[in-house]
Amino acid sequence: MPARFNIGAAACDRHADGTGRLALIYEAPDGTVERFTFDELKRLSNRCANALAGFGVKAGDRVGVLLPQRPETAIAHLAIYKLGAVAVPLFVQFGPDALEHRLADSGAKALITDGENLVKIPPGLSDLATVLVVDGDNGGHPPFWPTLEQAGDEFAPVDTAADDPALIIYTSGTTGKPKGALHAHRVLLGHLPGVQLPHDFFPRPGDLYWTPADWAWIGGLLDVLLPSLYFGVPVLAHRARKFDPEEAFALIGRHGVRNAFLPPTALKMMRTVPSPCQRFGLDLRSVASGGEALGEDILAWSKEALGVAVNEFYGQTEANLLVGNCASLYPVRPGSMGRPIPGHRVAVVSATGEPLPPGETGIIAARRPDPVMFLGYWNNPEATAAKFAGDWLLTGDVALQDDRGYIWYKGREDDLISSGGYRIGPTDIEDCLMKHAAVLMAAAVGHPDPVRGEIVRAFVVAKPEIAAGPALAEEIRAFVGQRLAWYQAPREIVFVDELPLTATGKIIRRELRSRTEP
């Protein structure tokens, strides 16, 4: 790990050599397509850095970025890193309360957004001195592009240490109030092996990367945008108001996307589209997925329908891309997240941090120091300390590791179901439910029971053409009971129109647990 490193310089400036190397393709909602070279990104991000400096932003100051996938988002990030400031990515689907919490908690001094999202910014944020507005009604704030036109083309990136703060990414809030995970510039370097292996030795000539995941989350930003730019691979940017699997395939085909990060929720929806390769002219080389466990059925479908094996990877906001698959190096075992990525010390440990032998269930942990590991929770030393047992960062995810090194995810600690003396992970049940021909999506949670402590309750979204009812519920119950242990079979099956999901596509099981009526 180098002592000095700056994300903005490494992901942009070193490729801006005057050759017109393609960096970014943007397809706007109206279908208009723009292309940006690394030379253009360098010039525009330099102007943005100069503009922010002119408004008094300096190294260490926090700058919010509230924009969807679009060129200005990439320009803003590169500028903030070059300036030595700290980027605070913000999801455009957040409401006023969520934005207020993140902007106030981070003490953001500046914000780059658009007119559509400006209206959600609450008044009275005492630290927020500057707002740049990309388009739409700027509400009297400086407009982004005219401001950049008045700024200079030259900017010398701050000589940051690899351990200097670079960005704050707020957790998705699946287990409580979102906390700001502070990452250093080195986090990009730490991600690289976890991008290269799941994408079968990324990059290769002709690679072009796209994800529907928003760049405000660690998956979109550090699994896709920044590593691709670091490797000199162009990225496709596109914002869909709502994920549509047919349009996703059409987008991939139109632009010749070779590499995709597709969250499990997206893959489950895309599985319903018939003959995608033939209909859309796909030429995918690699597909990676993470965020929720993938089922065996998705892996089988991807090989048959897409012609590629989906390589699952694993991480979290605090320490990402720790575990993954690489079909080119070792077999993808359905149900396993893969093996520890080289460069990371990963183990399954007890609650007190003792590594467990193969086959024993415990908590996935990463040992510090590690370049992908966060510096700590912003302004929350107590929560930071609670995240560790000695030098082991405890992810809170329960799994076992077999004697071949594969890690098998069982669920979050707080998602485990305790029934009749058995500790049951929801993942195996959900994987089995997804194999039933009538099931589109499924989630399993514990429900209080006076005899067993808890019973397994499954929430099921049936496929659109299926009539859900008691007969189907009994059929699904029997289907699971024949394939898993008897105590894993759901006692109750509840049909719902949709599952509650976080903005990153993770099932919010606590919300399902709180539903007292079937």
What residues fall within each predicted segment?
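Conserved pre-ATP/AMP-binding loop-to-beta segment of ANL
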Residues: 20-22, 149-170, 177, 202-208
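Conserved AMP-binding/adenylate-forming core of the ANL superfamily
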Residues: 24-78, 95-100, 146
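Conserved AMP-binding A3 loop
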Residues: 35-39, 166-193
